[in-house]
A protein has these predicted regions:
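Glycine-rich "substrate-gating" loop/helix at the edge of Rossmann-like oxidoreductase active sites
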Residues: 36, 63-69, 107
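N-terminal beta1-alpha1-beta2 module of alpha/beta enzyme domains
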Residues: 1-60
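Feature marks short, surface-exposed loop/turn motifs that line or immediately flank catalytic pockets
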Residues: 39, 66, 96-98
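Flexible, glycine-rich active-site loops centered on histidine and acidic residues
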Residues: 2-11, 70-131
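Alpha-helix-loop-beta-strand connector modules within alpha/beta enzyme cores
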Residues: 43-63, 67, 114-127
Length: 131
């Protein structure tokens, strides 16, 4: 029989509250705690949660890829992976046109081309920074 895994989504209005929810989820023996990009950065609560938990997986559902350059996103993900001892799950995603153009003040482009560039930056050869 397949094991049923149950995750929890953090909903607290503060990063401390989200980290505390992740600790509560672990105490309830949930499989993972997820943050999302709404009222705060999705990575910061997970950094706190990584220090307050020891077994639950921690992930972003989602971090908006368009709002970050690939290098800073990769470094944040790597740091969280190390801080959590391998429990971090990076969930990247796109947003709809109004969010991209209004909330982030970025030009709109077709998501497929941006996703391809993002995927190459994460799955391709090591990134290098010049300049």
């Amino acid at each position: 029989m397949t094991e049923l895994l149950i995750d929890g989504a953090t909903t607290a209005s503060t990063i401390d509250g989200c980290a505390a929810e992740a600790a509560d989820f672990e105490a309830m023996q949930l499989n993972a705690a997820w943050t999302f990009e709404a009222s705060h950065d999705p990575f910061l609560p997970l950094a706190l949660a990584a220090k307050q938990t020891s077994s639950i997986e921690l992930g972003t559902a989602i971090a908006v890829a368009f709002a970050r350059n690939p290098m800073t996103c990769a470094v944040s993900a790597w740091d969280l992976q190390r801080l959590s001892n391998g429990r971090f799950i990076l969930g990247l995603g796109t947003q709809i046109k109004p969010h991209i153009t209004k909330r982030y003040s970025e030009p709109w482009s077709q998501p497929s081309s941006v996703r391809l560039r993002r995927r190459k930056s994460l799955d391709g050869p090591p990134l290098g920074a010049l300049g």
